[in-house]
């Protein structure tokens, strides 16, 4: 992957003292990363505000804003009165709420809560940088200073969403994501044992760790790269279920890359090929709803 190589080159340069600039404000949430690159997170408590946007006999839709140490994070929740399970959903790059309105109603009608999290930097209401070279530059700088990277905060956002749903509805909550969002969700499910399981659609590792290893890099760049890779955590989800879905002709994330990540998961697990293109679609919705019913 060219993008992974470019980012890897930056990490090497940054380590050599190229003057990476980070935020000097101490973070309230804390983390540690072991020599094997495994991330441990202690997410700061967050307050939240929920405004009901629509409600009928089938479901209630609300806008939820988490007030975090680094700014507000927005999510949209659709749920029946008593959901039998819930899905914290991390969207793919550039995915907007508008593309999930019908999906939210469908899940709620089937008895499930669907919580769309507007990931930091994804171009929606929540500010931040999208995953890419600029974010890696910023986050690796913070990592080197012991400050909280945005990537880690995004994982905390998913954990906060899980806590809200679990406390409010006392129901199993699955970390779910499509494409890039599936990567964030895998890390969250591996770090937080209270997630009921993991559902990933059209997703894989980022490829950054492999790129650095191929270049013979060692030290902090490797630890940081490992700490953000889904493959570092997906094996830790067992004995909770791992469900993955991928299109054989996916034009964005190769089918083989999805299989490779799936191969690192423990049982119980299931890898399903679906029709379509890239990302979550109605066929995948049917599979998820049926398998979790």
Language-model-derived ranges and their functions:
Residues 237-238, 243-246, 250:
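Short beta-strand/loop motif that positions the catalytic acidic residue
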Residues 259-293:
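C-terminal catalytic histidine-bearing segment of alpha/beta-hydrolase fold enzymes
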Residues 106, 116-155, 210-213:
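Cap/lid segment of the alpha/beta-hydrolase catalytic domain
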Residues 1-33, 38-50:
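Secretory targeting signatures
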Residues 229, 254-262:
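Short alpha-helix in the alpha/beta-hydrolase fold that links the catalytic acid
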Residues 40-81:
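N-terminal cap/lid segment of alpha/beta-hydrolase-fold proteins
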Residues 156-219:
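Primarily recognizes the serine-hydrolase "nucleophile elbow" in alpha/beta-hydrolase
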Residues 83-84, 89-126, 207-208:
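Short substrate-entry loop that stabilizes the transition state in hydrolases
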């Amino acid at each position: 992957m060219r993008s992974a190589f470019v980012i890897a080159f930056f990490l090497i340069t940054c380590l050599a003292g190229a003057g990476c600039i980070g935020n000097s404000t101490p973070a309230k949430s804390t983390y540690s990363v072991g020599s094997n690159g495994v991330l441990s997170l202690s997410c700061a408590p967050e307050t939240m505000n929920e405004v009901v946007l629509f409600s009928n006999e089938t479901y209630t839709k609300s806008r939820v804003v988490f007030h975090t140490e680094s700014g507000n994070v927005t999510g949209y929740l659709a749920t029946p009165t008593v959901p039998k399970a819930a899905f914290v959903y991390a969207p793919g790059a550039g995915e907007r709420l508008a593309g999930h309105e019908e999906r939210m109603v469908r899940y709620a009608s089937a008895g499930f809560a669907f919580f769309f999290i507007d990931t930091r930097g994804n171009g929606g209401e929540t500010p931040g940088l999208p995953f890419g070279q600029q974010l890696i530059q910023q986050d690796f700088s913070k990592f080197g200073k012991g400050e909280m990277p945005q990537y880690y905060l995004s994982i905390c956002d998913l954990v906060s969403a899980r806590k809200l749903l679990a406390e409010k509805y006392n129901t199993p909550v699955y970390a779910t994501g499509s494409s890039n969002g599936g990567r964030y969700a895998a890390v969250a499910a591996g770090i937080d044992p209270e997630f009921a399981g993991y559902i990933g659609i059209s997703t894989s590792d980022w490829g950054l760790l492999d790129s650095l290893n191929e270049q013979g890099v060692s030290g902090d760049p490797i630890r940081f790269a490992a700490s953000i890779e889904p493959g570092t955590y997906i094996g830790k989800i067992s004995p909770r279920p791992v469900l993955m879905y991928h299109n054989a002709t996916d034009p964005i994330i190769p089918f083989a890359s999805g299989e490779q990540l799936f191969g690192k998961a423990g049982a119980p697990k299931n890898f399903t090929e679906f029709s379509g293109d890239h990302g979550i679609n109605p066929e995948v919705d049917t599979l998820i709803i049926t398998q979790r019913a």
